[in-house]
From Swiss-Prot:
Gene: DIM1
Binding residues annotated for S-adenosyl-L-methionine, in chain numbering: 37, 39, 64, 85, 113, 128
Coiled coil regions in record: none
Protein name: Dimethyladenosine transferase
The entry's keywords: Methyltransferase, RNA-binding, rRNA processing, S-adenosyl-L-methionine, Transferase
Catalytic activity: adenosine(1779)/adenosine(1780) in 18S rRNA + 4 S-adenosyl-L-methionine = N(6)-dimethyladenosine(1779)/N(6)-dimethyladenosine(1780) in 18S rRNA + 4 S-adenosyl-L-homocysteine + 4 H(+)
Pfam families, alphabetized: RrnaAD (PF00398)
Biological processes, Gene Ontology terms: maturation of SSU-rRNA from tricistronic rRNA transcript (SSU-rRNA, 5.8S rRNA, LSU-rRNA); rRNA methylation
Protein task: Specifically dimethylates two adjacent adenosines in the loop of a conserved hairpin near the 3'-end of 18S rRNA in the 40S particle.
A single GO cellular-component term on record: preribosome, small subunit precursor
Keyword Metal-binding tagged: no
InterPro entries reported in the protein's UniProt record: KsgA/Erm (IPR001737), rRNA_Ade_Mease_Trfase_CS (IPR020596), rRNA_Ade_methylase_Trfase_N (IPR020598), rRNA_adenine_dimethylase (IPR011530), SAM-dependent_MTases_sf (IPR029063)
EC number(s) on file: 2.1.1.183
Family annotation (SUPFAM superfamilies): S-adenosyl-L-methionine-dependent methyltransferases
Organism taxonomic ancestry: Eukaryota, Fungi, Dikarya, Ascomycota, Saccharomycotina
Source organism of the structure: Eremothecium gossypii (strain ATCC 10895 / CBS 109.51 / FGSC 9923 / NRRL Y-1056) (Yeast)
């Protein structure tokens, strides 16, 4: 007996549309300012859902369901789907699409801005992401009290490549270092612009994000605060980033707050200007870690953790 053919989820458009999409141009004028680019290729839609490896007991969060081309496929596999939709017209279309079907009872639609919505518990997140909320969405997922087991997310190609970039890559940036601290990110597939209606101006990619378990024992705001400083100019030396007046003022303010919680406040005040002390502490940390002349764009997670720990040892904080 011959081998069964493998499913292929290429980003090449088949030219065939999901049936319920065929009348959409006469019903809607899509708002591209809201990132409304509806995925119309059924093979790509099915590929995205399959990569989530949904269990029958799973609750799936979908961000920006649109007219439901992903939603109806997720509903076939999940216990429940919570769909967060900003556009009331899209929510109404999705409601009509499942009305009178067994899937209707499994679908909950939350109408509103995803970034302002308090989310219920969910196991998996799937999203054809409105590109303007790509970064906020990723960090909201990462910082959930109980983050999803896995997220399968469609992004603008360049944004996806930034998530995946490694030290030394041209696209390696604060986003790369930050997300990779908390999650493992892998590339799933490229998706060409002709797979959408209306076609976006850029190509897309789907990525898989799995939150690390257990969560690294690092304060998110401290980690983020350090990266914001060193990646202001990723190709300048790290020491240059700490010479900025604005950065020194923030570091001094945080140091004062730290001293207020310890018994060392009077001692440090007696040593002279706090601003001067902060400068000296920064210089000492950078010299002792050997990172003074390194560039953030070449540094890895170990380098940044080493730097953060050394700053904390001398009472300097970033949040």
């Amino acid at each position: 007996m011959g081998k069964a053919a493998k499913k292929k989820y290429s980003g090449i458009s088949t030219g065939k549309e999901v049936p319920s999409e065929q009348h959409m141009n006469t019903v809607f004028k899509f708002n591209t300012d809201l990132g409304q680019h509806i995925l119309k290729n059924p093979l790509v839609a099915q590929g995205i859902v399959d990569k989530a490896q949904i269990k029958p007991s799973d609750i799936v969060l979908e961000v920006g369901p649109g007219t439901g081309n992903l939603t109806v496929r997720i509903l076939e596999q999940a216990r429940k789907v919570v769909a967060v939709e900003f556009d009331p017209r899209m929510a109404a279309e999705l409601t009509k699409r499942v009305h009178g079907t067994p899937a209707e009872k499994k679908l909950e639609i939350m109408l509103g801005d995803f970034m302002k919505t308090e989310l219920p518990y969910f196991d998996i997140c799937i999203s054809n992401t409105p590109y303007q909320i790509s970064s906020p969405l990723v960090f909201k997922l990462i910082n959930q009290p109980r983050p999803p087991r896995v997220s399968i997310l469609m992004f603008q190609r360049e944004f996806a490549m930034r998530l995946l970039a490694r030290p030394g890559d041209s696209l390696y940036c604060r986003l790369s270092a930050n997300v990779q601290m908390w999650a493992n990110v892998t590339h799933v597939m490229k998706v060409g612009r002709n797979n959408f209606r209306p076609p976006p101006q850029v190509e897309s990619s789907v990525v898989r994000i799995e939150i690390k378990t257990p969560r690294p024992p690092v304060d998110f705001n401290e980690w983020d605060g350090l990266l914001r400083i060193v990646f202001v100019r990723k190709n300048r030396t790290i020491s240059a980033g700490f010479k900025s007046t604005a950065v020194l003022e923030i570091m001094e303010k945080n140091y004062k707050a730290y001293l207020a919680t310890t018994n060392d406040a009077m001692v440090d005040d007696a040593k002279g200007s706090l601003a001067e002390q902060v400068k000296q502490k920064i210089e000492t940390v950078l010299a002792e870690t050997g990172l003074s002349d390194k560039r953030a764009g070449k540094c890895d997670q170990t380098d940044f953790l080493k730097l953060l720990y050394a700053f904390h040892q001398v009472g300097l904080h970033f949040s």
